[in-house]
Amino acid sequence: MKKPLLTVTLCFLMILPVIPGAHGTEYRSDIASALLRKRLERASPARILCEGRVICSSRILPKFYARRDYRLAWTSEEAPLPQASALVKFIREVDKEALIPLDYHLDLLEYLQSEMVKAKAKAEKPPAALRVDFDLLMTDAFLLCGSHIISGRVDPEKIYEDWFARRRYEDLSSVLQVALDMNSIEETLRSLIPKNPGYERLKKALLDYRRMAAGEPWPVIPEGPILRKDGRAEEIITLRKRLVLTGDLSASQNTGNDLFDDALEEAVKKFQGRHGLEPDGAVGRETRRMLNTPIETRIRQIELNLERWRWLPVELGPRHVLVNIANFGLEVVENDKVILTMKVVVGKNYQRTPVFSGKMTYVEVNPYWNVPASIATEELLPKIQKDTGYLKKEQMKVLRDIGNKRTEVVDPGEVNWHELSEDNFPYRLRQEPGPKNPLGRIKFMFPNRYGVYLHDTSERGLFDRTRREFSHGCIRIEKPLEFAEYVLRGDPDWTRENIQAAMASKKTRVVMLPEPIGVHILYWTAWVDEDGTVQFRDDIYDRDEDLTKALQEGTLIP
């Protein structure tokens, strides 16, 4: 196997001369420092090369060494310092965080470290150039790894147009210097890892699924008729084995025979529930598809969603609302405990619900629906042109701007609708509060760049569907009354009864929340519930695919 040192001039050597004496008998610290300084000063700004590769922290790294007066950070004149071993150890284990050790020069660092250890064993001192190479790579490894831990390997806003991330920032150069001074390299990097229990649970799931992948392969359930309770088939024996491997069926309940009994039905329901399927207990086409998804795909899903955790703020808030688009679900969380759940309807694939965080500050009871221009011209105008009575039946008004932020109501009978088009529509449409209003009786506002909010709906039947991507981007919620009661908690004027009365009154009212509540619109295709159940969902917007491609193309430069 070819050694990774590549003639020991692995970092920056091809662009800079060697200082006389650096490889000879002189090993004073000032020789190594002078060599380090010359390399950094002669390197192109923001383009420090290492065997043809750009050092990822090339914007931060020179400033770090300048502050130190170019003193080496990771070695003495004889050998690597203890903090170097601590960093190498951390990098060796960083795959537990779904990060890649080789991204942080692990192979080169281990080789250079071993070369210095060999030199010490021979009572020799390592060449200054080797020490400088090692030092630069170590510093780059810390800065890059730290950056990936706190804000992810890629920037989601460069992958998705509809993803706004409040990613964390740290002055990693200063963080590194403090860690070196305190001799706490490993502890410092661990302190940067997300502390949310959901991240920790998903990280444990990654370890569990990697162990499963190293064990007995998941058997494939062949295509065939629907398997259901009281039936017999050879495939049922295979089904039992498959469900035992993922813990959906306990080993003690596995009779090993071909009968679809009560215990197997419950195991199938459990499997279906944690994969977002209707838990009917029968193994049809969709359940077979989920059962036959390779474990490598599931591991990749977990890794992608750990990356998404790193895009979130450090604190989600002691009270916050989580909407998982891929799960069509909403959770209210207090002190890391889920206290309220409900189904939601999200945007269609071509009108996707965006991902972002905001602060809910008020609710609007009996809201008007100000129809977005795109919906008015693309969807409603053709209906109006076919039936001029459509607006009256739908309780809609036609408005026209008259300047100074004022509008006037226009008689729809005075408008020549057939002359209008998507490019020629000088009106606005507004639907009155009432049973036909798609916003229902209440909406929950957290101002944002996307104009997205949570709201009641007049189409209650959609919550009976398993997949619920039907909206234009806003989020319809299953339990608006319970949710309103929660967010207005603390205001004695807004009891459940008073909220119901206000909704029934048909009068539009804006009510400020007693205190703002964080709202996080997320997209998770893999997560772990509080009870330890590993959940997977279909990638309804193909965002897993986009993220996989971005990670393959390159990682974020700090």
PLM features: residue spans?
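Bacterial N-terminal signal peptides
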Residues: 8-17
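Bacterial N-terminal signal peptides that target proteins for export
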Residues: 1-9
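Cationic-aromatic interfacial patches
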Residues: 25-169
